[in-house]
C-alpha cells in the first residue's frame, strides 16, 4: 500500500473525509496528525481551507472573493489549503524552520505566509496600530515605564506574556532544538521557542513579520464567523482598561445580538445588512465588507482597524485625532515626549490625522450607521459622543493638575509618572474611568458613562 493510499484509508476508517483534493505533502501530514493532534485535524476539516481549492476561490466574483493575491504560485492552485501549504512558506527566512520527516516545516505561520493568498489584507494590517502593538509598548519609554513599573512590577518574561504582551504580542525566537515524544513514544527534534505560545496582535514572528492572523481567525478553522462575533474581540477589549465588549454587551446593539445572533448568517461575503444580520458587531463597524440588499457596497473590507476611526478614545490620557500610522512611538508632543498630547491635553503638532481626514473617516463610519438609522439619529449620536469626550477629558485634566501640584512640590517624583500611589490613582482616572465613559458614548452603553 502506498503512503497516499494509506492516508486515504486512514480518513475512511476514522470517518473523516477531505472536502477537496489534498497535496501529497498535506496528506502525509494528516496521516500522522489525525492520531497525534486529532483536534487540529478535525478543526481544519471544518474550515473553508479544507473545502476549497485556490483555483475555486479565485473564480469567485471579485466582490465575493476571500483571496486577494492575484498571482498565486501555480503548484497551489489545484489543492485545498492544507498543513503543508501553510507550514512550508518562506522557509529561508523562518528561524523556526526544521527538518520534519523529510520536509522543511515552520512551526509558526505568520502574516507573511498568509500573504501568499491574502496579500491585500496583510498589507492593510501592516499599517495598523495592532501590527505594531508590541513596539508601541517597547519603543515608547513612557508606556514601557507604565508596564514595567506600574502594571507588572517584579515581573518575569512569562508573566509579561500573560499580561500586557498577551494581547500586544511577544517576540517569538528560537533558543535551539529540543527533544519531544510522540504518543507512540518516538523521539523527534523540534525548535525550542521562547515567548511562546502567543497570539497577540503585534507578535513578532520568527520570520521577522509582525502580527498574528489567529488573534481573530483562530487556527485551524480560521473562521470568518468567529472573527465577526464580538467574543473574539473581547479577549483583549474588555474591562477594566479597554471595556469595549462590556459596553457593547449592555448596549441596544448588544441586546439584540445576544437575543437574535444565533439566527444570523455569519459566513456570507459581502455581509448584507438587514438580511444576513440585524445589528452591528465590532467587525461590522470596524472592518467588514458590508452591502445592502441591492448589492450596493456600504463599507469596503479593511484589515487596518483604525481606518474608519477619526478619534482615538482609549489607552491614552486624553481623546485625540487618530495617529497617521501604527508607529505611534514616533509622535512627539510639545514637551518632547513620544505621546499624542501633553499631560495637559495639547495635541502634538505632527503625526496625527488632520481635520479633512477626520471628516472622511467619520463619513465612512456614518455610512454604516445610516444603513439602519436616520440622519438626525446618527448626527445626534456623534454629537453626544463628542461632548462626552470633552467632559471626560476635562475631568482628567483636573486630576492631572492636582498631580502636577504634587510633582511641583516634590510630594511625588515626576521622573516616572506612573509608580507612586497618587500617580496610580491618576492612572485609574483616565485608563479605567475616562476610557469607560468614552466607550459608553461611542457604543451607546450609558451605564458605563
List each model region and its residues.
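Short, contiguous pre-domain boundary segments
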Residues: 21-29, 104-111
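Primarily the internal scaffold of c-type cytochrome electron-transfer domains
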Residues: 37-72, 92-161, 170-449
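Local sequence-structure signature of Cys/Sec-based thiol-disulfide redox active-site neighborhoods
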Residues: 19-28, 275-278, 366
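Loop-rich non-cytosolic ectodomains and luminal regions
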Residues: 166
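Long, well-ordered hydrophobic secondary-structure segments characteristic of membrane-embedded
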Residues: 74-85
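Bacterial N-terminal signal peptides that target proteins for export
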Residues: 1-8
Amino acid at each position: 500500500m502506498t503512503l497516499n493510499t494509506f492516508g486515504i484509508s486512514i480518513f475512511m476508517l476514522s470517518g473523516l473525509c477531505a472536502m477537496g483534493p489534498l497535496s501529497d505533502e498535506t496528506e502525509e501530514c494528516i496521516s500522522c496528525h489525525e492520531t497525534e493532534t486529532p483536534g487540529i485535524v478535525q478543526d481544519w476539516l471544518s474550515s473553508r481551507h479544507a473545502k476549497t481549492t485556490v483555483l475555486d476561490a479565485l473564480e469567485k466574483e471579485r466582490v465575493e472573493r476571500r483571496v486577494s493575491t492575484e498571482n498565486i504560485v501555480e503548484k497551489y492552485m489545484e489543492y485545498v489549503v492544507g498543513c503543508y501549504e501553510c507550514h512550508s512558506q518562506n522557509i529561508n527566512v523562518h528561524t523556526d524552520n526544521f527538518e520534519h520527516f523529510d520536509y522543511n516545516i515552520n512551526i509558526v505561520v505568520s502574516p507573511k505566509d498568509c500573504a501568499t493568498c491574502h496579500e491585500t489584507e496583510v498589507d492593510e494590517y501592516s499599517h495598523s496600530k495592532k501590527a505594531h502593538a508590541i513596539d508601541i509598548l517597547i519603543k515608547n519609554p513612557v508606556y514601557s515605564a507604565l508596564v514595567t513599573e506600574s502594571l507588572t512590577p517584579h515581573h518575569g518574561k512569562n508573566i509579561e506574556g500573560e499580561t500586557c504582551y498577551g494581547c500586544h504580542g511577544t517576540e517569538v525566537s528560537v533558543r535551539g532544538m529540543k527533544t519531544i515524544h510522540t504518543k507512540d513514544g518516538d523521539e523527534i527534534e523540534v525548535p525550542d521557542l521562547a515567548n511562546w505560545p502567543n497570539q497577540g496582535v503585534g507578535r513578532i514572528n520568527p520570520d521577522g513579520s509582525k502580527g498574528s492572523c489567529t488573534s481573530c481567525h483562530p487556527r485551524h478553522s480560521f473562521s470568518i464567523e468567529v472573527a465577526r462575533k464580538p467574543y473574539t474581540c473581547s479577549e483583549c477589549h474588555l474591562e477594566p482598561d479597554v471595556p469595549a465588549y462590556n459596553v457593547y454587551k449592555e448596549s441596544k446593539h448588544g441586546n439584540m445580538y445576544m437575543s437574535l445572533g444565533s439566527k444570523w448568517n455569519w459566513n456570507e461575503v459581502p455581509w448584507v445588512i438587514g438580511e444576513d444580520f440585524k445589528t452591528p458587531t465590532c467587525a461590522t463597524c470596524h472592518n467588514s465588507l458590508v452591502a445592502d440588499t441591492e448589492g450596493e457596497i456600504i463599507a469596503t473590507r479593511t484589515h487596518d482597524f483604525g481606518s474608519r476611526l477619526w478619534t482615538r478614545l482609549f489607552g491614552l490620557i486624553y481623546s485625540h485625532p487618530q495617529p497617521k500610522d501604527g508607529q505611534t512611538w514616533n509622535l512627539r508632543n510639545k514637551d518632547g515626549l513620544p505621546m499624542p498630547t501633553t499631560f495637559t491635553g495639547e495635541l502634538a503638532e505632527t503625526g496625527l490625522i488632520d481635520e479633512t481626514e477626520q471628516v472622511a473617516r467619520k463619513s465612512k463610519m456614518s455610512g454604516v450607521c445610516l444603513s439602519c438609522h436616520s440622519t438626525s439619529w446618527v448626527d445626534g449620536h456623534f454629537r453626544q459622543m463628542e461632548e462626552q469626550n470633552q467632559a471626560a477629558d476635562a475631568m482628567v485634566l483636573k486630576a492631572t493638575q492636582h498631580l502636577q501640584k504634587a510633582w511641583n512640590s516634590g510630594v511625588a517624583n515626576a521622573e516616572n509618572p506612573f509608580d507612586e500611589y497618587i500617580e496610580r490613582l491618576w492612572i485609574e482616572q483616565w485608563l479605567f474611568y475616562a476610557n469607560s465613559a468614552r466607550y459608553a458614548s461611542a457604543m451607546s452603553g450609558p451605564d458605563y458613562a
